[in-house]
Curated annotation (Swiss-Prot):
Organismal lineage: Bacteria, Pseudomonadati, Pseudomonadota, Gammaproteobacteria, Pasteurellales
Family: Belongs to the DsbB family.
Subcellular location: Cell inner membrane
Residues exposed to the Periplasmic side: 32-49, 91-145
Organism field: Histophilus somni (strain 129Pt)
Protein name, entry field: Disulfide bond formation protein B
Length: 177
């Protein structure tokens, strides 16, 4: 089974599909913000940046999936983004479940000074909502709970692909199969 996942990681179509899935999630977030008028909070913005990391890893893996260095780089960026996104989403759910005055998220994002995304792209990365508000739900789950499921799936995907990189692929031999 690990050989299947290693071969899967060496195909460009896998990385394109990963890129498209992250692009769809980013587009959906922008539709929720600008189309439906839902105000994103700081944690929503951070989760959006984590999805951008997964999108970026799909782009890197798509460049040359057969090159081990680029494949490992894409896996590391994707795994790091999935872990960070999952941790952020769990913390965001804590803000929604335990609504206390001392359990609040910041109102202004804390981006590095060298990468102030909220200043460069305010229509995308400027928060205007509260982290404890639940403004949307689907099938009984809030948006944050769905984000946890999505990041958990990405995390499992990247873990399996990372482990499969250590599996040696044997050459097909015609004799003595």
């Amino acid at each position: 089974m690990l050989i299947f996942f290693k071969n899967l990681s060496m195909k460009r179509s896998t990385w394109i599909l990963l890129f498209i899935s992250a692009l769809v999630l980013e587009s959906t977030a922008l539709y929720f913000q600008h189309g439906m008028g839902l105000n994103p909070c700081v944690m929503c913005i951070y989760e959006r940046v984590a999805i951008l990391g997964i999108l970026f890893s799909g782009l890197i893996g798509c460049i040359a999936p057969k090159w081990l260095v680029l494949r490992i780089l894409a896996l590391l960026i994707g795994l790091g983004s999935a872990v960070k996104g999952l941790l952020l989403a769990i913390k965001h759910l804590d803000y929604q479940i335990n609504v206390y005055p001392w359990n609040q998220c910041a109102m202004v994002p804390d981006f590095p000074q060298t990468l102030p995304l909220d200043k460069w792209f305010p229509n995308i990365f400027m928060p205007s909502g509260s982290c404890s508000d639940i403004t949307w739900s689907f099938l009984g789950f809030s948006m944050v709970q769905w984000i946890i499921v999505i990041f958990a799936c990405y995390f499992l995907f990247f873990i399996i692909l990372s482990i499969s990189q250590f599996k040696k692929v044997r050459k097909n031999r015609m004799l003595f199969r």
